[in-house]
């Protein structure tokens, strides 16, 4: 969150972020596996909630993180589909926002936020693509992450 505040983006919709922390999560998922990525994600969410946020912020973060990690892990392990880390990250960005949307729908009702869904979907698509591109660069240029899986 602190790092993200150094790069303010003029995004006109509340709650839409680039999700730079997801770069680390995706790299950990590929390097160390699901359990480690889940641990990092939960610890990040807790630290963020205690430092900058609230219980509701943690619920949004947890729902998005867990759902996206489960789906990304499933796609990563489906080797017969030949989905790259870029594709996995794009789907992760979208499913992260779907998880957060589900929490918001549960809290305020789906009809109140349904018009917001297309913006969340496309922001997840774009953010997931940008993070996916960074993941590919990191896996190519940083020896620690250059494994073939």
Predicted segments — roles?
Residues 35-77:
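Helix-adjacent hinge/juxtasegments
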Residues 1-28:
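Hydrophobic transmembrane alpha-helices
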Residues 19, 41, 45, 61, ...:
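Hydrophobic transmembrane-helix microenvironments that flank and shape a buried ionizable site
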Residues 54, 58-59, 78-149:
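Membrane-embedded alpha-helical hairpins and interfacial helices in multi-pass inner-membrane proteins
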Residues 1-4, 43-53, 93-99:
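Aromatic-anchored segments of alpha-helical transmembrane domains
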Residues 10-13, 73-80:
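Short, motif-level signal for alpha-helix interfacial/capping segments enriched in acidic residues
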Residues 20-34, 71-76:
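Generic transmembrane alpha-helix motif of multi-pass integral membrane proteins
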């Amino acid at each position: 969150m602190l790092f993200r505040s150094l790069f303010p983006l003029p995004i006109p919709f509340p709650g839409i972020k680039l999700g730079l922390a997801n770069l680390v999560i995706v790299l950990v998922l590929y390097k160390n596996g699901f359990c480690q990525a889940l641990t990092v994600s939960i610890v990040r969410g807790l630290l963020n909630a205690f430092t900058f946020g609230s219980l509701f912020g943690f619920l949004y973060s947890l729902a998005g993180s867990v759902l996206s990690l489960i789906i990304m892990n499933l796609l990563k392990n489906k080797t017969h589909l030949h989905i790259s880390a870029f594709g996995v990250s794009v789907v992760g960005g979208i499913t992260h926002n779907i998880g957060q949307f589900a929490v918001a729908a549960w809290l305020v009702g789906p009809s109140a936020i349904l018009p917001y869904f297309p913006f969340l979907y496309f922001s997840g698509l774009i953010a997931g693509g940008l993070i996916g591109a960074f993941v590919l660069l990191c896996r190519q240029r940083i020896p620690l992450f250059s494994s073939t899986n």
